[in-house]
Swiss-Prot record:
This is Formate-dependent phosphoribosylglycinamide formyltransferase. It comes from Ignicoccus hospitalis (strain KIN4/I / DSM 18386 / JCM 14125). The keyword ATP-binding applies. Pathway: Purine metabolism; IMP biosynthesis via de novo pathway; N(2)-formyl-N(1)-(5-phospho-D-ribosyl)glycinamide from N(1)-(5-phospho-D-ribosyl)glycinamide (formate route): step 1/1. Its EC number is 6.3.1.21.
């Protein structure tokens, strides 16, 4: 457990280097700055959100081994914080061997980026419930795997996020095409796909769970789950609310799954464990991110400490007694409709007239269709009231050319 904090930009400072500098990273940087940490923000493009609040910034290809290693060795940070999936994980493994602290650890980052390795860990090693699944190395194996798990089946790249490369297949022909799409749209190099049972989803939860140093050892703490919803045909986060509107039995099962998976991954910091609640009553592990989760943006309004504050404290080796859920809250993303450079946000005044509403405008340098440009947050006496407020405010906003 850490007892001393230094001063940024002096020889006493603790230094954090973010690999990925999006909107989630920006909130982490703000929390680190509050603790006097010197922060370096790295991303594949300039003027990314977290770069706006960091002390220094670098633009590199984060999938390139040498570029990742070079920027870390140049800055020599006390902690490396991966904020996105598109990172060369072999570089992180080797940097950890050199003595650098990777959050939560290089093994966890590498496993969670790979759907096949993650499913093996969760279902086969830890033994938590998941959908039926099989792995495919070619088009014919994808068709055979769909026969095994049953049609319709979901085909996903070994490495991807936010629905990229997903196909719902109802025939062997569609399964073969789905495999080709999975490889084409994978993030990074991918030669395999995972084929999963298609389930009718009733609810989707994020079981935010963190590990911190209490001074007497590492403790794992599950938080009240966040619930989120994606309109039909949309795979990315669109709207979330907190606490989840599910019964206590589902909450307990979700927390139990999350704790088991997170303990196996180890390290320090917060994890976003994605849970599916099916219409036939099953509570299933889906995926996990070893970092703050986009659906957890709602905790900026709902909790005593947001997921970002928790992450910042935990990765610095500071204790984080379980924070309170202060109020029901909801979030809704602000999406762009077209490519614009630079983009501006119109309708802000009217949106902020809605009681209980806050806005985070990420100030990304350019937009494209359906790019997440901001998020609205709202509190209320109930989740339903918070959702009504955030949806009403969203109706006023539009991303436009400046």
């Amino acid at each position: 457990m850490r007892e001393v904090l230094g001063t940024a930009l002096t020889s006493s400072s603790q230094k954090a280097l973010l690999l990925g500098s999006g909107e989630l990273g920006k909130e982490v940087v703000i929390e680190l700055q509050r603790l006097g940490v010197e922060v370096v923000a790295v991303d594949r493009y300039d003027r990314a959100p977290a770069m706006h609040v960091a002390h220094r910034r670098y633009v590199i290809d984060m999938l390139d081994y040498d570029q990742v290693v070079d920027v870390v060795r140049r800055e020599r940070p006390d902690v490396i914080i991966p904020e996105v999936e598109a990172i060369n994980t072999d570089a992180l493994v080797d940097l950890e061997k050199e003595g650098y602290f990777v959050v939560p650890n290089a093994r966890a980052v590498k496993i969670t980026m790979n759907r096949i390795e993650l499913r093996r860990l969760a279902a086969e090693k830890v033994g938590v419930p998941t959908t039926r699944y099989a792995f495919a190395h070619n088009e014919d194996e994808a068709a055979e795997a769909c026969e095994k798990v049953g049609y319709p089946c979901l085909i996903k790249p070994e490495m991807s996020s936010s629905g990229h490369g997903h196909t719902l297949a109802s025939s062997p022909e569609e399964a073969r095409e789905g495999f080709k799409r999975a490889l084409k749209e994978a993030r990074g190099k991918s030669e395999r796909a995972i084929v999963e049972e298609f389930v009718e989803i009733d609810r989707e939860l994020t079981a935010l769970t963190y590990r911190h140093d209490t001074g007497n050892g590492i403790e794992t703490v599950p938080l009240p789950p966040v619930e989120h919803k994606r309109p039909k045909g949309i795979y990315y986060y669109y709207e979330s609310w907190h606490p989840a509107t599910v019964n206590d039995e589902v909450v307990k099962k979700a927390k139990d799954i999350a704790v088991k998976v997170v303990n196996e991954l180890g390290g320090l910091g917060i994890f976003g464990v994605e849970i599916l609640v099916t219409k036939d009553g099953r509570v299933l592990f889906s995926e996990v991110s070893p970092r703050p989760h986009d659906t957890g943006l709602v905790t900026l309004a709902s909790m005593e400490l947001s997921e970002f504050a928790i992450h910042a404290r935990a990765v610095l080796g500071l204790p984080v007694p379980e924070p309170k859920l202060l109020t029901p809250a909801a979030s809704r993303v602000v999406l762009a409709e077209e490519a614009l450079e630079p983009p501006c946000l119109k309708g802000v005044g009217e949106a902020l007239k809605v009681k209980g509403v806050q806005l985070r405008w990420f100030a990304k340098p350019r937009s494209y269709k359906e790019r997440r440009m901001g998020v609205l947050l709202a509190t209320g006496s109930t989740v339903e009231e918070a959702l009504e407020r955030v949806r009403r405010a969203a109706g006023f906003l539009k991303v436009v050319k400046c």
